[in-house]
C-alpha cells in the first residue's frame, strides 16, 4: 500500500498535471467580475457586460483596424538604446531588454500601412505595456516616420495614443521628441492630409502636450484618462477638490476637449467614414448579392409526353 501511495500516485499526478496559464482569467477593474481571457480577446478586449475597455496591444489594435487583418510593418529608424547610460534601481538597458522580451516589440510605437475599408492609411499605435508607452527617441522617430510615410503615400494618418508621458531615462532627448513630432504634424497639415488622434487609456504627460492634441479630429475611447498632470498633483497644487470624472473621456467631451467618444467596436467604421469625408473620397460600394431567381420550368420532350385522347 505504501508503494502505491508513495510512488505510483505521485507519478500519475505528474502525468495528468496541466499548467494553468497566468492570464486564463481577467478581473474587470470596474465591476470586479472574473472573465475568461479568450472571451475578452475575442471581444476586442472589452469586458462583456460592464463594457470596460481594457488596454489593447499594438498588434491586436492594428489587426482590428486593417482590412483582412493584413498590413505592412513600416521599417523604423534605429536609435542609440541607452544614450545617457542611465541607471536608477536597475540599468535602463536592462529595462529595455525586459520590455522587448515581454512585448515582442522594439519600442513603444508600432507603425503599419494598409487598407481601411479600401482606403490606404498609415496607423501608429502606442503600446502601454512597453514601459508605459513612454515617449523616447525610438517612439519619437516612429511617429515622425509614420507622418513622413503618410505624406509620401498621400494617405491619412491615424495615431492611437496610450502613454504615461516622456521617458525620464532619456532626459532632454525624450523631451525633444515633443517639438519634433509637432513639426512633423505640421508637415502633414501642409500636405492637406487628415490627421486623426484616438486617445486611449491613459493618454497623459508629454504625449498630451504634443501630437496627441494636434489632430484634425480627436476621438476618445469610453472612460479613457486624458490629461497632462495627474489629478492628485493638480489637487495638491490648487488646493481644491476636482469635480467627479475629471480628466475622463466623457468629461472632456462635455467641455469641448475631444470631438467624440466612440466605443471600440465602432472605431473602425467611424475612422473609415472620417477618412472618406476629410479626403472627399467616395463611399465604398459593396456589391449587392444577385437576386435569387426561381428555377426554370422543366421542359418535356415530345417523345416523353403522355398520350392524350382526341376530343370528339
UniProtKB/Swiss-Prot annotation:
GO terms for molecular function: acetyl-CoA carboxylase activity; ATP binding; carboxyl- or carbamoyltransferase activity. Coiled coil: none annotated. It is found in: Cytoplasm. Residues 24-293 form the CoA carboxyltransferase N-terminal domain. It is an enzyme of class 2 (transferase). GO terms for cellular component: acetate CoA-transferase complex. Pfam families: Carboxyl_trans (PF01039). The keyword Protease does not apply. Keywords: ATP-binding, Cytoplasm, Fatty acid biosynthesis, Fatty acid metabolism, Lipid biosynthesis, Lipid metabolism, Nucleotide-binding, Transferase. This is Acetyl-coenzyme A carboxylase carboxyl transferase subunit beta. It comes from Bradyrhizobium sp. (strain BTAi1 / ATCC BAA-1182). The gene is accD.
